[in-house]
Amino acid sequence: DFMEMVGKRLEKCPMEIRYAYQEQTKMLPEGMTVPPERGAKPWGTSHAVLCAKNEIDGAPFAVINADDYYGKEAFKVIFDQLSASEDPYGYCMVGYELGKTVTENGSVARGICEINAEGFLDVVTERTRIEQYEGGIHFTEDGGESWTEVAPETIVSMNMWGFMPSFLQEIKDRFSAYLDEYLPKNPLKCEYFLPLPISQLIAEKKATVKVLSSSDRWYGVTYAADKPVVVAALKNMTAEGKYPDGLWG
C-alpha cells in the first residue's frame, strides 16, 4: 500500500503534498477509448505527468523516477535553474554519464543525449537495451542481432527533468496525435514517453533544454542483484553524515 509505505513518511516532512493518479481514462482526448485488449497498461511517462496537471497548478516543476536516487546536488541545480528562468519554454534536465548508470546484472534502458556546444539538448533517443560487457558498453535495436558501441562518458537522461507550465499544455495537445499514429500500430504496448514531445519541441525550435550536471552519483535498482550495492551506498552516505540516521524520524 503506497500510503502505508511512503505517504505516512512524507507527511512528517514540512511541505505540502498532493497526490495525482495515473488512470487510463484520465486526460484521454475526446472521443478516444481504451482498447479492451490493452488491459491495465498505462500510457507512459508523458501521460503520467499530464495526469498531475491540475495538482501542479501553473508553477515550474521537476519530474523524477520515484524509485531512483539522484543525489542532493541534482535537486539544487534543477531548482536554481527553474527559479532563475524567465523563458516560458526554457526547460532543463540533469544528465549523468552512461558508464555510471549501467549494471553488470543485465540490460538497461536509457535516454541517449546529443548536446550542442552551448550545453543545450539537441536530441534524446530512448535505447531500451543497453548492456555493459568486458570491452565496454553497447546497445542493440534488433534483439541482439547487431550491436552499436557507445562511450561510457556519453550523457544520458535518467528522467530528471525541469519544466515550465507550458510543457503541460504541449503534451496535452500532442497526446491525440500520438495516439492516432501509434495506437493502431501497437494497441497493447504503445507508451507516450517523455523524450518524444521533448524532441519534437526542440526540433520545432519551440523549446530549449539546458543540460545540467551534478557531482552526485545516480543509483537505482533495475535487478534484484543491484539492491546490495544501493543499500551499501546509502549506508555509507549516512555514515558520512550526508543523511540522518533514521531519515524519517
Language model features by range: what are they?
Residues 1-65, 70-71, 75, 84:
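Conserved N-terminal catalytic core of the sugar/cofactor nucleotidyltransferase
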Residues 20, 62-65, 93-97, 213:
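Short beta-strand segments
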Residues 172-207:
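A C-terminal functional module that forms or caps the active site or interfaces directly
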Residues 71-160:
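Conserved core of the sugar-phosphate nucleotidyltransferase
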Residues 160-172:
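Conserved nucleotide-sugar donor-binding
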Residues 226-249:
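Generic C-terminus detector
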Residues 29-40, 106-112, 225-229:
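Short, surface-exposed amphipathic charged segments that create phosphate/polyanion-binding patches used
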Residues 155, 210-216:
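Catalytic beta-strand/loop signature of glycosyltransferases that borders the donor
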